[in-house]
């Protein structure tokens, strides 16, 4: 699986073994602007301020 791991969408990395989800964190007030991206083994929960989206296809975040 390859996930974007920087704020610019054209940079990606291959996820390590066991981390088979990509995630993207955005601020609830500014959903178009990612604040963090990367690989994860379990999808982090969204909070009042931060929305988290997870997916399992290459570069889907």
From Swiss-Prot:
CDD domains: TFP_snake_toxin. It comes from Hemachatus haemachatus (Rinkhals). Belongs to the three-finger toxin family. Short-chain subfamily. Type IB cytotoxin sub-subfamily. This protein lyses red blood cells and has cardiotoxic and hypotensive activities. One of its GO terms (cellular component) is extracellular region. Is classified as a P-type cytotoxin, since a proline residue stands at position 31 (Pro-31 in standard classification). GO terms for biological process: killing of cells of another organism; regulation of blood pressure. Disulfide bonds join 3-22, 15-39, 43-54, 55-60. Keywords: Cardiotoxin, Cytolysis, Disulfide bond, Hemolysis, Hypotensive agent, Secreted, Toxin. GO terms for molecular function: toxin activity. Expressed by the venom gland. Pfam families: Toxin_cobra-type. It is found in: Secreted. This is Three-finger hemachatoxin. The keyword Disulfide bond applies.
């Amino acid at each position: 699986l390859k996930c974007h791991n920087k704020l610019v969408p054209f940079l990606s990395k291959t996820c390590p073994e066991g981390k088979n989800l990509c995630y993207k964190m955005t601020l609830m007030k500014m959903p178009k602007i990612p604040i963090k991206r990367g690989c994860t083994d379990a999808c982090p929960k969204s909070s009042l301020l931060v929305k988290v989206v997870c997916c399992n296809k290459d570069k889907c975040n």
